[in-house]
Swiss-Prot record:
InterPro entries: Ribosomal_uL16, Ribosomal_uL16_bact-type, Ribosomal_uL16_CS, Ribosomal_uL16_dom, Ribosomal_uL16_sf. It comes from Spiroplasma citri. This is Large ribosomal subunit protein uL16. Disulfide bonds: none annotated. Part of the 50S ribosomal subunit. SUPFAM superfamilies: Ribosomal protein L16p/L10e (SSF54686). Pfam families: Ribosomal_L16. The keyword Hydrolase does not apply. It comes from the Bacteria.
Amino acid sequence: MLLPKRTKYRRPHRIKYEGKAKGNTKVDFGEFGLKSLDGAWITNRQIEAARIAMTRYMKRWGKVWIRIFPHMAKTKKPLEVRMGSGKGSPEEWVAVVKTGTVMFEVAGVSEETAREALRLAMHKLPVRCKIVKKGEE
């Protein structure tokens, strides 16, 4: 699972995922990428599930780059607790993904293998995505 080693603050303010991404919008490392068409918070479990789906389909050939990282702690209060008395404790770690962010990249495999691996990863994520080729963003 991906999570930060240390953070400056335990319980950060929420970061909005509306709007378009400013950076991380092009395929930089691999040949094919998975680009988000919506904004969302993606948990470290969803990132790991997508990574496993891709690497298992590619049978460990090629290389996978994960371009997002879950920096933000999402807090939750226990069940049946009254309102107030502070913010809840950190429950899970999420990555803030905006529209147009390239989340995963793949290289070293054929085009059909890369497209199928990225398609399998798409089904593990809570955002609509599209597969992009390097230079065709």
